[in-house]
Amino acid sequence: MILGQKEKIMNSWIFRVVVLASAVLFISSVQAETNVDKARDALAKKSDDADSTRQLEEVFQAAEKNYSLLRSGGKSLNYSLDYSYISDSRIDIDIVNNVVRNLDINPSATHSFTNSFSFDYGVLNNLTLNARLPLSTRYDTQQSLSVTDWGDASFGLRWQPFAYVPGKATVTVSSTLSTKTGVSPYEIDNRLRLSTGSGTYSVSTGLSVSKVLDPIVLFGSLSSSYSFEQNGLNQVRGGRVLKTVQQGQSFSFSSGFSYSLSYDTSLSISTQIGYSTETTLFFSNGTSASSPDSVSGSMNFSLGIRVDPKTIMNVSFGFGLTEDASDLNMGVSYPIDIGAFTW
């Protein structure tokens, strides 16, 4: 009897131990599966965050081309239509022996429409070449003048010295050569014809920085432009013959932010400030005339919209903050699919 009771007690304890051990093992397995699920969810969230950040950057870069590059071998063709309105007054004077002669004030209200095709090619993953060809139409409502002609073609490159790292600031260095293929303002009669170009060759360099702080992209850029001296001119201005032009050097700074309305739509707000040194005109009679240094400022807004998985359209609007800036700017750009073409 005593042995039977001991066996029953022993079996009872063994049963309890087995049940307790099974419960512990079951709970441990459930916790392990839960931890694995949490780890998978965490990894999935990180992957989704990287994808959404990249989408935001793509929409932003479509609006701000200075901050974007193509992969090696990549090609893109972009069409843009820009409108600007400038209203000012031009004063032509001739000063002889401290006496002002031929004083002439010419009011001007110019509407400009520019159709541009820009082609980009990725030489390396961090180096992109680009070319831009504009066709400009201008109207002066005060003088009843109009012109449609090519503008100044330009060629440039964009280079990222550091590899792209999600979440880190992106640095882009750019350089552009602008030609004088447009109608020069120094080779026409300003009273009878309008210009579509700058009249000189110029070289510009710039540095751009952007950083994604979802849902905001902060960006800023600093650039400088130098225009080469233009000789061999023969333009009559204020009773004198213009022979040489030395345009001043210019500097520009812009900064702003792009806010993500969604991962397919972003609104960019930026301001730009420019400073240009004096421009000197040399005439055939040995005299010269210089314009004062100028400061220009503008406020710009742009909306980038992803209309399909591979196409982002950009609409922009801006206005001048100083007298030397354009009164009004508007534009729209749209990429053209050239995937079927190979070179």
Where are these regions (language model features)?
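Outer-membrane beta-barrel biogenesis signature
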Residues: 32-95, 340-343
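Short loop/turn motifs that connect adjacent beta-strands in outer-membrane beta-barrel proteins
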Residues: 34, 65-74, 109, 126, ...
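Detector for outer-membrane/organellar transmembrane beta-barrel domains
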Residues: 72-88, 192-283
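Residues on the lipid-exposed face of transmembrane beta-strands in outer-membrane beta-barrel proteins
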Residues: 77-81, 117-123, 131, 155-159, ...
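Transmembrane beta-barrel strands of outer-membrane/channel proteins
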Residues: 79-85, 131-135, 173-181, 220-226, ...
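Outer membrane beta-barrel transmembrane domains
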Residues: 90-105, 240-343
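Residues that define the transmembrane beta-barrel architecture of outer-membrane proteins
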Residues: 111-115, 146-153, 169, 197-203, ...
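Outer-membrane pore/translocation modules
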Residues: 137-138, 144-242, 290-291
